[in-house]
Amino acid sequence: GIALASIIINKTFDEQMIRHMILNSLRMYHKRYKEEYGEMILAVDASNNWRRKTFPQYKANRKKDRGTSTFDWNEAFRILNKIREEIAENFPYTVIRVDGCEADDIIGTLVTMNPDHNNDFKPQKYMIVSSDRDFLQLQRFRNVRQFSPLLKKELSVDNPRVYLQNHIIRGDKGDGIPNILSEDNVFVEGFRQKPMSQKKVDEIIQDLEDGELLYAASWYRNYCRNKKLIDLSETPPELRREIINNFMADKPDTRWMRRGKVYPYLVANRCNPVSYTHLTLPTKSSG
């Protein structure tokens, strides 16, 4: 997301410049957070999105807008995919891409992989580097924080559970998800959503807490629709297992061996190796 935004803002398809920009960003965040949060994990969107299969209107307008845009989206994604593959092959970062999943699914799965419900041990701490507020729901876990590269500050929310309920009820226009009072096709057909006041939101939250006769509520079907799409705990179990398997497969000794590829890669791509000595294998001293 960070890299794509930079391409759009700078209006450049200079592959070398984009490569430098991405590598510099990764190096900066790796050095900033490694000591407290451990090794960097790169979560990448894949094709065959399961949400679109569940709800065909999901992000439908984005695809339509890209089809009419003068911006060369195919070239942008070609460059980003190429650099992503280079990083996975030549750097000691764990890169996870699972067919059918968005990066959101990967992050939402990994931060819950070792839950600490009883507070009897210290779970792995996570710093999510993203400006996407969809991740605020994950702050219900005390080991999760988020930094926004766009705002250059940490994002936080007082009550992540209430935040998630509000998000589900109000929907997400950017992702083509209507509020729970509106029909599935409201955005793709260009209709207006039914108005949703905060008073109505609060009433629905109270009904959900009471838990009585929810199936009879006119909005309950759409609430379930939105929860499936927005709540990151709803990622299908088979995809969660594949995410965890991918993560576990990238063992420390495998990452260590990739350090031997960093220096040749940087030289071949005219990057300054001196800035990346923390990622390369130590050289033997002479004598």
Please tell me what each predicted stretch does.
Residues 204-246:
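Phosphate-backbone recognition surface of nucleic-acid-processing proteins
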Residues 265, 269-275:
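Catalytic core of IPPT-family isopentenyl/dimethylallyl transferases
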Residues 277-283:
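Conserved small/polar residues in nucleotide/adenosyl-binding loops
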